[in-house]
UniProtKB/Swiss-Prot annotation:
It comes from Oreochromis niloticus (Nile tilapia). This is Peptide YY-like. Its main location: secreted. CDD domains: PAH. GO terms for cellular component: extracellular space. One of its GO terms (biological process) is neuropeptide signaling pathway. InterPro entries: Pancreatic_hormone-like (IPR001955), Pancreatic_hormone-like_CS (IPR020392). One of its GO terms (molecular function) is neuropeptide Y receptor binding.
Amino acid sequence: YPPKPESPGSDASPEDWAKYHAAVRHYVNLITRQRY
């Protein structure tokens, strides 16, 4: 499996959080695609 995206710190900017959430969504899509 690809590595899970690391959560930005609590002091991260909104842009960092947006990138993190996009990476998590992509990560979940990769895993569910492999599973089914």
